[in-house]
Amino acid sequence: MYAAMPDERFPIPAVDISKVNRRFYRQLVDDPTGERPGTIVVDTRRFYLYLIQPRGKAMRYGVGLGRAGFEWSGRGVIQWKQEWPTWTPPAEMIAREPELEKYSAENGGMAPGLNNPLGARALYIFQDGEDTLYRLHGTPEYWTIGKAVSSGCVRLMNQDIIDLYKRVSTPSPIIVRSGALTSV
């Protein structure tokens, strides 16, 4: 499941599974959300992303999340998907971390590749027709799954974002819940 992916545009190394808690491995589970099939639900309390399947099932993935003050929650739509995306940090991030200026929109962003923070795939979250600037995306830093350390996006292991990317069509509803699954 987390083997090397040598046929990718940028060959992806295997995940050292000793650095990832087994509870975050991708697996088919009973749907705890009650949402319609095709809906993505992020449980920020447990660090899980669910892709709701038919017949009361869900594909569950472990995720990494934004640190306090950088998270997003609410309802939106996956409006766009990209393989090996270019990363362009938002102006607010560049203001906090001026060394990222070289990756600004004006400078063309960071080229796709294994060191790109968006990893192998990105799914773009829109709300009310506008890009939220939040993404579901891969990460080469798989040891951060289950932690809140990023600038707000939902990160998955590259192998998992590739699996999710194949399963999700656009547009698809997404719900990012900041509390227990029984509340929105």
For each feature predicted by the language model, list its residue ranges.
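N-terminal pre-domains immediately preceding structured catalytic cores
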Residues: 1-184
